[in-house]
């Protein structure tokens, strides 16, 4: 309802006028899009093993947690390999782009079979890794509330924050590659 009690007719009985319609594409992409910067992603994935090794000695008395860390590191390594493979593929398209910000829009949103296949692999690997990171975050959350936990609270808090950063990075990674691996159906 609009001010004064005016009620709009049903949408199918309306004519829509988009002022600033030339911005509609960019606005839709910002609102519904997903992105990850490949080089930044590779940088934090490559830094992750060193960060894990720094935390491992602090948590060696917690067997469950200390067993999780090498698994998280291995999965991050596999993910790094896959994301590294994406860089040269996507760079080819960026080199074709005339967009000032170095962006490329795929015609009709179709990224092609090669990128779609790689995206599927990255999605599967990221999904599994995300699950491990969620378990790590839950374990650290429980450790924070355990007064008898053998690690000082400030160390747990620091690692909890770091794990949260990894988790949010993995979620962003998954959001993008999950969208890219799905083949568009005709008319979408």
Task: Specify the residue positions occupied by each region the protein language model found.
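Conserved coupling segment at the C-terminus of the helicase ATP-binding
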Residues: 2-16, 20-188
């Amino acid at each position: 309802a609009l001010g004064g009690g005016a009620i709009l007719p049903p949408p199918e009985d309306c004519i829509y006028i988009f002022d600033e319609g030339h911005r509609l594409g960019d606005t839709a992409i910002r609102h519904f899009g997903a992105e990850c910067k490949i080089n930044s992603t590779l940088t934090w994935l490559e830094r992750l093993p060193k960060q894990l090794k720094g935390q491992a000695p602090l948590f060696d008395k917690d067997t469950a947690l200390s067993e999780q860390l090498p698994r998280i590191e291995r999965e991050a390594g596999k993910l790094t390999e896959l994301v590294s493979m994406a860089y040269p593929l996507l760079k080819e398209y960026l080199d074709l782009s005339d967009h000032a910000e170095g962006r490329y829009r795929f015609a009709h949103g179709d990224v092609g079979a090669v990128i779609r296949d790689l995206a599927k692999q990255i999605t599967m690997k990221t999904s599994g890794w995300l699950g491990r990171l969620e378990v790590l975050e839950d374990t650290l959350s429980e450790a924070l509330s355990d007064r008898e936990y053998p690690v000082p609270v400030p160390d747990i808090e620091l690692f909890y924050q770091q794990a949260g950063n990894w988790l949010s990075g993995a979620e962003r990674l998954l959001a993008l590659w999950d969208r890219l691996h799905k083949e568009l159906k005709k008319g979408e």
